[in-house]
């Protein structure tokens, strides 16, 4: 600690900004110099470990005291992870104080279910200093100003926001002229068509988990032509993604949608290099365009019908992956692992292409199959790929964890007996 004490204040503040705030405050016991240094650290990072109603006051008291005594001219970051019982009035006050301190990064998390929704202070909607805003809590946006003004905001994360109308969503995003990253998880709101119109947006994750929707003609409308990374997930039984625009700079896309126009989706994704799909089986006549840049494709096994269709349109494909995970509900903040279909939607038939796709002849090198069950349709797909992929180097198959040793041995014997057109192809089975 003596060596650190020799450093200039600015350097010490930088070091302390990487330390939890409780530890930072405790440094006031080290010496007279350290007694006041913590007050100038431009970051408050508090994570409340309590989940019981009788202890939430400890978090309120600590945060109140820190903000009251804090003397830095600018509060760079306010990061709060709070228990579900933290009073909404306290959170609203802390947000207001942070805005008055010209906060740049405002990250508020509250465990759900909570004691009640939060009404964001109106001053937040015109905070021009914000660069990143994370609101992972149950909050309502209904008393918003006519215009939002987030001139500096580059990253916006909204989980479980309750917007009162389509118009408020439009006004919010139009007030973010330099927005680059957006994450949305919808649970229940009053928005019919959630329009994401953001010309500067480069990264988007949009997830619809609503159980009830106001009508049938609802969903996301995405107008973001500069996207480089796109993730769309729909677990709602009644809504879908209404429309997309062409995204010529798209590099990575993951689409898991129970309802929607497959033709519309595929035609807008042709520039991507990495693609993951979990969609309704396509119609034979579905035009999808040519994926000239695609090198990695991940298909959910509920969508095996896409395999035959898309292989004919991916001349440079090098990696092909199959998987389906639906046995349990993954945590909401990690829904990318979850199949959007029910068990009855798993495809049981597959027809091989009428002619061998170009990628199987010249580019496909790796095939992976996660949670292989040994079903007849799975064996047919594996057999076709082994018998026709001339450049294939690796076929890696991982069985379900619940598969017993006898079943694994039988699967391995069946797979090993399949003829491989590429003699250098290695078969890995676990």
From Swiss-Prot:
Transmembrane segments: none
Location of the F-box domain: 1-49
Pfam families named in the record: F-box, FBD, LRR_At5g56370
Domain of life: Eukaryota
InterPro entries, sorted: F-box-like_dom_sf (IPR036047), F-box_AtFBL13-like (IPR053781), F-box_dom (IPR001810), FBD (IPR006566), FBL13/AtMIF1-like (IPR050232), LRR_dom_sf (IPR032675), LRR_FXL15/At3g58940/PEG3-like (IPR055411)
PANTHER family: EMB|CAB62440.1-RELATED, F-BOX/RNI SUPERFAMILY PROTEIN-RELATED
Protein name: Putative FBD-associated F-box protein At5g56440
Taxonomic source organism: Arabidopsis thaliana
Organism classification: Eukaryota, Viridiplantae, Streptophyta, Embryophyta, Tracheophyta
